[in-house]
From Swiss-Prot:
This is Myrmicitoxin(1)-Pr3a. Vertebrate-selective toxin that causes pain by targeting voltage-gated sodium channels. Residues 1-23 form the signal peptide. One of its GO terms (molecular function) is sodium channel regulator activity. The lineage of its organism: Eukaryota, Metazoa, Ecdysozoa, Arthropoda, Hexapoda.
Length: 74
């Protein structure tokens, strides 16, 4: 099975752009808003800020692993 190069590059670009949205600086709450919200909101904000972006990378990695035999044969 031959996979077009543009499709392969598109899948990689979409996967990487999805994982980069987790690192968006606008997603982090401001310190002033967190201080006004209380200790529970501060703990949640810290947990969200420290969360690793593993979820968007898992489909990309699994796709790449499944495409390796097709890439090597083609």
């Amino acid at each position: 099975m031959e996979i077009p190069k543009f499709l392969f590059i598109t899948v990689i670009a979409i996967g990487l752009s999805g994982s980069l949205t987790w690192a968006n600086p606008l997603a982090n709450p401001e310190a002033e808003a967190t201080a006004e919200a209380g200790p529970e909101a501060e703990a949640v904000a810290e947990a969200i800020g420290e969360a690793e972006p593993a979820l968007p990378l898992l489909p990309l990695i699994s796709l790449l692993v499944s495409l390796i035999p097709a890439i090597k044969s083609g």
